[in-house]
């Protein structure tokens, strides 16, 4: 359409008139596109699925896109997202991204959705919505009033439903394990969710107290959600501790992961510890920085991913394409992959990638990775977070593997 508008305007000789006409045509086209009647024209008559999602990218985005490739063969998938920077709700066709409706008013979208034949609602992630608890009520309203009497499926990519600090890192920067000296409310009063004040307020919105937060989420799980899909047994145990009444609704369905060829590591003398993925505080940046202070001369730490303010004596590879992981592991002569996350990751693609390549792997005894690493013959589960001690535990583990390989 942009080409058509430019072609029409090209015929107008007066520049000022041409600019006004272009602006008028562009505004008219945007209004036509951003119209629910135009939007509904994209429906094919198949069953409709509503996919409620955040707009923050990351592993949740990867999961959504993989699911859309499967679901779009059977459903018209409508994806609802909230963009905090613009304060706009976006409703898009996941199977046809050219159709999009945007509005500041969620009630407009809710009223529209109640009038079409939605068969399923997937609550994939609500992090950074304007008010998460209000959004839970919107989803409940759509379920009650929708023509299709939809089933509601919740996906547990993080722990937002337990605490707005969705990785369960407390005000002291440590994994809380659902407890804090003085209680959750004391932690919550001091907890900073972002260095950016606007982001901090967005992430805290709808959460006056943790007690009220869990009451509203508990009501959603009990009265709105028909199933709760989690990706690992250890994560289910955490959810059940917070909400014992939901146990019968939980289904454990691990992510499907890409299989990689085995990495072929050449003989070498030094020890190379690979930290796989983008490393933030909750992903273990503090652990890596402390290890770097006591790194022996023959031991290297390589972050395959990104890490801000990394110590000078570690290597940061930067962004990478997942399909090239075996070659990258071979380039750095990887001896072991270390997953330093200090929060209970709900799945961890990087853990599966390392196992798929046949590499030794180490992680802390927290969350989904620990369960898989404990069953892996080349896995090391570190029972406490003590970076100085952990570094030499990893080094000793690599040395023992080398001795076994010589036998």
Annotated model-derived regions:
Residues 2-407:
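Catalytic cores of nucleotide-sugar-dependent glycosyltransferases that transfer UDP/GDP/TDP-activated
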């Amino acid at each position: 359409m942009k080409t058509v508008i430019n072609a029409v305007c090209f015929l107008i000789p007066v520049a000022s008139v041409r600019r006004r006409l272009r602006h008028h045509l562009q505004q008219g086209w945007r209004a036509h596109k951003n119209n629910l009647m135009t939007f509904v024209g994209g429906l094919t008559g198949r069953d409709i699925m509503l996919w409620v999602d955040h707009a923050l990218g990351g592993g949740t985005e990867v999961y959504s896109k993989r699911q859309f490739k499967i679901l779009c063969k059977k459903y018209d998938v409508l994806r609802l997202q909230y963009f905090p920077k613009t304060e706009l709700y976006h409703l898009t066709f996941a199977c046809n991204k050219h159709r999009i409706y945007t509005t500041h008013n969620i009630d407009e979208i809710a009223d529209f959705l109640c009038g079409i034949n939605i068969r399923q609602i997937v609550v994939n992630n609500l992090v950074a919505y304007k008010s998460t608890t209000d959004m839970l009520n919107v989803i409940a309203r759509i379920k009650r009033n929708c023509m299709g009497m939809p089933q509601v499926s919740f996906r547990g990519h993080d722990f937002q439903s337990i605490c707005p600090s969705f990785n369960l890192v407390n005000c002291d920067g440590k994994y809380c394990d659902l407890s804090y000296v003085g209680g959750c409310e004391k932690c919550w009063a001091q907890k900073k969710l972002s260095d950016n004040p606007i982001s901090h307020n967005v992430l805290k919105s709808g959460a006056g107290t943790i007690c009220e937060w869990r009451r509203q989420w508990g009501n959603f799980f009990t009265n709105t959600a028909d199933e709760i899909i989690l990706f690992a047994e250890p994560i289910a145990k955490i959810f059940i501790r917070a909400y014992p009444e939901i146990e019968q609704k939980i289904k454990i369905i691990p992510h499907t992961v890409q299989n990689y060829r085995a990495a072929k590591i050449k003989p070498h003398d030094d020890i190379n510890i690979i930290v796989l993925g983008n490393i933030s505080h909750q992903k273990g940046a503090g652990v890596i920085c402390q290890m770097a202070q006591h790194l022996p001369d023959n031991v290297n730490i390589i972050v395959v991913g990104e890490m801000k303010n990394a110590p000078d004596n570690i290597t940061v590879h930067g962004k990478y394409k997942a399909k090239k992981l075996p070659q990258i592991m071979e380039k750095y002569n990887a001896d072991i992959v270390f997953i330093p996350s200090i929060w209970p990751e709900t799945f961890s693609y990087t853990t599966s990638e390392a196992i798929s390549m046949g590499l030794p792997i180490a992680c802390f005894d927290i969350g989904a990775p620990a369960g898989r690493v404990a069953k892996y013959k080349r896995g090391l589960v570190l029972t406490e977070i003590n970076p100085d001690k952990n570094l030499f535990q990893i080094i000793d583990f690599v040395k023992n593997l080398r001795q076994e390989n010589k036998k």
